[in-house]
Amino acid sequence: MRAGLGPIITLALVLEVAWAGELKPTAPPIFTGRPFVVAWNVPTQECAPRHKVPLDLRAFDVKATPNEGFFNQNITTFYYDRLGLYPRFDAAGTSVHGGVPQNGSLCAHLPMLKESVERYIQTQEPGGLAVIDWEEWRPVWVRNWQEKDVYRQSSRQLVASRHPDWPSDRVMKQAQYEFEFAARQFMLNTLRYVKAVRPQHLWGFYLFPDCYNHDYVQNWESYTGRCPDVEVARNDQLAWLWAESTALFPSVYLDETLASSVHSRNFVSFRVREALRVAHTHHANHALPVYVFTRPTYTRGLTGLSQVDLISTIGESAALGSAGVIFWGDSEDASSMETCQYLKNYLTQLLVPYIVNVSWATQYCSWTQCHGHGRCVRRNPSANTFLHLNASSFRLVPGHTPSEPQLRPEGQLSEADLNYLQKHFRCQCYLGWGGEQCQRNYKGAAGNASRAWAGSHLTSLLGLVAVALTWTL
């Protein structure tokens, strides 16, 4: 049944009211202490030694690679083969570790997690970002479409094999129940276990939450970027996941179809807004930090994002109040001298100047509007306002030695700049601070909240034994 106009309007009103209300405090920045972190997680480590093309990445707060063989990084990605016994079907359709989650063994999976985590994150300190990248199936049954339908088919077959006399509708309902229950147990208890092993890290699943707003392909002329109402409701079905996560990692990879169009900003904006909505909804006293995955290039080929699309991705994410962006890439980005040279030129000419601009603009806004105890968030999420350094007030100057910043701003905020920030942005305070400009110190209360937050990591293991004992092998 198609949703009517009434529910859509109601949802829109709820979202606007939620945005207009007081922002919950969030975790303080990690790594550099900046309100907006920019991370480079692209496997370009071979550009210098193999292809003789060194890349200057000093402007990034974090440098890491998602490739195998690298440990103790500030950002760690756990793919399906790096964390326990993730049930899935491979590309040939062969069942691996049971295929569907209800056919997997949580009893065998959980004990392997400690070894997996300690292999890639070898020390407790310092904290970092830990991203679980499990994309083979989705925990909401109806979202397993197209090539993921194999998980629904297999689930139905398992039920039908046990109950050959059941009608198809009963088989389907039971299959959905068993799949969603098992998927929840696998994801939930994995999160609980790994948080207990490395409690200083911020843990979450890549691409959660998703917005499913890719309908620009079919509806280019009428495309708005809004998340379908039904998908927002389905995200709320995952309240158990958001309650256990300590960070959210949505993705805003741009297809070249969207290049430099008004749709690119709408596509990104509503995906980030949905993540921020989820971040504020499922914890009573704090909001989860949101780190947005993006790419330095469009999803097909090696064409760097245009200036317009850098604003639509990095700039939009910063203005909406995300904690940072993570640039991800694959081995093709550094597969030859030509690709490395292209990235080198792109970094120097376009990407680095822009991220330095935005990073410092968010920092200045935090200092002047939030006493350095919070990050600036756009008052109107739909407004065409950004955290950019005013070219009339600042210029970027290069460092002259490797120990100096790659680029740094020179200048100061004008009265007009300060008025602009005050008019268009408000503060989201870090835990321990409150007030309109984060001027009130609540660190005693925040300490209790932080201990409760961290304590949930340590106590979560208590429930795992019971789950494991009742798991159907």
Swiss-Prot record:
Record-annotated active site: E135
Q: Which residues are glycosylated?
A: N74, N103, N357, N390, N448
Q: Which cysteines are joined by disulfide bonds?
A: C47-C340, C211-C227, C365-C376, C370-C427, C429-C438
Instruction: State one molecular function term (GO).
Output: virus receptor activity
Residues bearing covalent lipid (GPI-anchor amidated asparagine)?
Answer: N448
Provide the tissue specificity. Widely expressed, with highest expression levels in kidney, lung and liver (at protein level).
Q: Any idea where the EGF-like domain is?
A: 361-439
- The primary site where this protein sits is membrane
Q: Which UniProt keywords apply?
A: Cell membrane, Disulfide bond, EGF-like domain, Glycoprotein, Glycosidase, GPI-anchor, Hydrolase, Lipoprotein, Membrane, Receptor, Signal
Specify whether Lipoprotein is a keyword of the entry. Answer: yes
Reaction equation(s) it catalyzes: Random hydrolysis of (1->4)-linkages between N-acetyl-beta-D-glucosamine and D-glucuronate residues in hyaluronate
Q: How does it sit in the membrane?
A: Lipid-anchor; GPI-anchor
Please, which domain of life does this record's source organism belong to?
A: Eukaryota
Which residues form the propeptide in this entry?
449-473
Known InterPro entries for this protein?
Answer: Aldolase_TIM, Glycoside_hydrolase_SF, Hyaluronidase
Q: So what does this one do? A: Catalyzes hyaluronan degradation into small fragments that are endocytosed and degraded in lysosomes by HYAL1 and exoglycosidases. Essential for the breakdown of extracellular matrix hyaluronan.
Name this polypeptide is given: Hyaluronidase-2
User: Species name for this entry?
Assistant: Mus musculus (Mouse)
Q: Mind giving the lineage of the organism this protein is from?
A: Eukaryota, Metazoa, Chordata, Craniata, Vertebrata
